[in-house]
Amino acid sequence: MSESRKLFIKTYGCQMNVYDSERMAEALGAKGYVLTEVAEEADMVLLNTCHIREKAAEKVYSDLGRLRPLKVARPDLKIGVAGCVAQAEGEEILRRMPLVDLVVGPQSYHRLPDMLERTEGGARVIDTDFPEEDKFEHLPERKALRGPTAFLTVQEGCDKFCAFCVVPYTRGAEVSRPFARLMAEARALVEKGVREITLLGQNVNAWSNDGRGLGGLIRELARIDGLERLRYTTSHPNDMADDLIEAHGQEPKLMPYLHLPVQSGSDRILKAMNRKHAAEQYLRLVERIRAARPDILLTSDFIVGFPGETDADFEATLALIRAVGFGSAFSFKYSARPGTPAAEKPELPAELCDARLQTLQALLGEQQRAAQAAMVGRELGVLYEKAGRLPGQMVGKSDYLHAVHVEDPGARPGDLVRVRITASGPNSLAGERIGV
């Protein structure tokens, strides 16, 4: 295979997909492919997809349609669909989109080079199995790092079976990667210049291996010289073990930020969602987390318009939001996903869902602006990730995951500095460097 072949990857959805796209690029890099940011010049286009909402899935088909002129002009162009839409729809993608050469599910990325080779003879290839072998054992060593931060998948899959969610069907059962392999990969990342690692999993705090839970893993990772920061996402409230909560108060390298989805503040809706916890349990959990780390910034996920949601249910969600005070949150109208239990229930009127979402987002936006404004005057650690748009400007992330713009000529990505926050905006902060 020619060393000059180019690969374009479009990534949809969660951080796990970002990580998976990096690993697929590395797997194909071993076959001579180099990344390009221009689809028109690529020899292979790979869409790494998200199936969590209907709009995300339909966007994939729309984007595939836009690739048709490229395929017509260059029949040798290879087009692949990866990720959760690939896993969920499989053969349907090949049926609807004749231009697609291969379809690969999240658990089969290590087979991608072989699949691509099989398409060279004109075959259309699909692999959406859940293989017994560990895909991570068959992927090459990570090489192309884009900056001082990196994702590290520690856990995949989900056993929770929330009534609205496709993840258990597209990602499979919960599987924890071995402790020793994670430590080795983390050390290798640090040797390549990484200073912050975010641990990933569909239910990352369900990770367990070798007698350790996620709190124990974090404590061991924190002992790696040169690794300055740790984060993890996404968590389920039912898997917030005591040891993990204690780590937030005891481990300085674990950043004071936690994404803890709750979805609703109504016990009736939480039960219908099969979340297996009540609103009061979530509130007590928040109290325990803040007792361990009082300055922690909490974010969450919310769904409005779940089948059967009444005005009282929605008001209960607003009450929970007011009680917690979130730094930010992702919020969506309910989207029925085929094959999930909730998809069989009658949906609420779209106008009602739109109105509830607008009300919810107004409250969340108010809390986010307040959280941003509260940072003004504080001194925070900021890890520079890239140059800003203005001359001499750097952009990095604060301890609380805020984007921070700092005028700091001569600084470089990877510098970890102290910054006094001088201004807050809707989605970022500005500050001045005061030290290291």
UniProtKB/Swiss-Prot annotation:
Coiled coil: none annotated. GO terms for molecular function: 4 iron, 4 sulfur cluster binding; metal ion binding; N6-isopentenyladenosine methylthiotransferase activity. Pfam families: Radical_SAM, TRAM, UPF0004. It is found in: Cytoplasm. [4Fe-4S] cluster 2 binds at residues 158, 162, 165. Keywords: 4Fe-4S, Cytoplasm, Iron, Iron-sulfur, Metal-binding, Plasmid, S-adenosyl-L-methionine, Transferase, tRNA processing. GO terms for cellular component: cytosol. InterPro entries: Elp3/MiaA/NifB-like_rSAM, Methylthiotransferase, Methylthiotransferase_CS, Methylthiotransferase_N, Methylthiotransferase_N_sf, MiaB_methiolase, rSAM, rSAM_horseshoe. Its cofactor is [4Fe-4S] cluster. Residues 5-121 form the MTTase N-terminal domain. Binds 2 [4Fe-4S] clusters. One cluster is coordinated with 3 cysteines and an exchangeable S-adenosyl-L-methionine. SUPFAM superfamilies: Radical SAM enzymes. It catalyses: N(6)-dimethylallyladenosine(37) in tRNA + (sulfur carrier)-SH + AH2 + 2 S-adenosyl-L-methionine = 2-methylsulfanyl-N(6)-dimethylallyladenosine(37) in tRNA + (sulfur carrier)-H + 5'-deoxyadenosine + L-methionine + A + S-adenosyl-L-homocysteine + 2 H(+). [4Fe-4S] cluster 1 binds at residues 14, 50, 84. Gene3D superfamilies: Methylthiotransferase, N-terminal domain (3.40.50.12160), tm_1862 like domain (3.80.30.20). Monomer. NCBIfam families: miaB-methiolase (TIGR01574), MiaB/RimO family radical SAM methylthiotransferase (TIGR00089). Belongs to the methylthiotransferase family. MiaB subfamily. This is tRNA-2-methylthio-N(6)-dimethylallyladenosine synthase. It comes from Cereibacter sphaeroides (strain ATCC 17025 / ATH 2.4.3).
